Amino acid sequence: MLKTDSRKITKGDTFLALKGVVTDGHDYIEQAILNGASKVICERGSYDVETLIVPDTRVYLAKYLKDTYKKQLDSFKFIGITGTNGKTTSAYLIYQLLNKLGKKTAYIGTIGFYVDDTRRELNNTTPDLMDLYDMFLDCYDKNVEVIVMEVSSHALELGRVLDLEFDVVAFTNLTQDHLDVHGSFENYLNAKQKLFKMVKNDGVAIVNIDDSYGDKFLFESNFNVTYGIKPATYQILDYDLKINKTKFTLKVSNNSYDITLPIPGKYNMYNFLVALISAVSLGYDIEDVLKKIDLIKTPKGRFDIINYNSNVIVVDYAHTPDAVLNILKSVLEYREGKVYTIIGCGGDRDRTKRPIMGDIATTYSNYVIFTNDNPRCEDEKQIMDDIVCNLDRNNYEIIYDRKLAIEKGISLLKEKDILLILGKGHEDYQIIGKEKTHFDDKEVVLEIIK
């Protein structure tokens, strides 16, 4: 059996050495042989067992898996979503809508692997090839018809979706993130664009034309469908934002549709349109899709609302400058009282976005409490220094302990105020140093206000 984890090798297995971001499988070849590997596939070296040298083991693995499981792959429709923000909500809405329409659909992404309303936690937004194919086989056994995936820039850069072909791809937006991995914004853009070169000949490419980089994803070789407030295939004519819903008029060809989304936020209009267009691209009538609209909801940690007296507490995953700006602008459109924000930045990650997020939070909030997100192995004081280094306002304080920060934020609420707790969303853990402990923002809020 072909395996990429030396620890799982048993007698007679073939070990394939993959180079990752942190580790290189070539460093574990000897261990794999000791564990019983009878064959090694790698890019370099000489070993005491049968050895196949190939130019790129990741390319080899992708072709091997595609050839081996062609029957299973051909039974699915694949939908891939990429972008800085909105991937999870867009993909999760597609998962819900298609299942409500009677098309058995699985979801793979940030919040896990969903099939038959069961959830399995994942380590990465887009798993590696071996794990991905395990999920595909599980989907095949369960008669899944459509697989909707979040496709991250990491996955595209590292070849985790090599040789897959998509029936529908969608671009949500592009803003600063992951520069610690890609090195430059241009590299980040190039990584995202790779998904749009993986569309089947009869596939559909869905593009947010309002995004400043939208035109970079309009490839002539694709059948492009655009959406946005600007003139587009699916055009938003007007909208009205409320704390618990969003109303807007949608123009498609010569038809107009008045839509009431049971989820708030201007950005969720965009996320919903990705889901709507994906369903239509698979052959559903737009009016049939809209009939299911009352049945959808956002995933955990995406604008999770907790009512507290006359106030509203919102837990959200917003952890990039653009996501933070979008959620703050949205709540400012319907706030009646003050807006308080609790936010931090992850450690051992892109430092350049920290002062930007600090500026956005203090500009659009009445008051901000900066706190720990997942500091990991980075000094928490360094993270805070980066966040506040350019601030000349005094409408903020720093409370490193996240639970104490949430307690303080709740204590500030008076009447019809809004408290945003940003950055972690669905996560039920906090990483400090190398220790991962249970921590769930929503649980903490409910415990405090009970």
Name every feature range the model reports, one short phrase each.
Residues 1-63, 67, 212, 235-239, ...:
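N-terminal leader/targeting and accessory segments in enzymes
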Residues 8-14, 20-27, 277-287, 291-301, ...:
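ATP-dependent carboxylate-amine ligase
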Residues 12, 37, 48-49, 102, ...:
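Short, well-ordered alpha-helix to beta-strand connector turns
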Residues 33, 42-49, 142, 166-313, ...:
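Acidic, Mg2+-coordinating active-site environments of NTP-dependent enzymes
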Residues 38-44, 205-209, 342-343, 366-374:
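Short internal beta-strands
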Residues 44-45, 110-111, 153, 174, ...:
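Short, ordered loop/turn segments at secondary-structure junctions
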Residues 47-48, 112-115, 155-157, 212-216, ...:
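Short, active-site-adjacent cap segments at secondary-structure transitions
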Residues 61-209, 213-223, 279-280, 334-335:
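Phosphate-binding loop of NTP-binding sites
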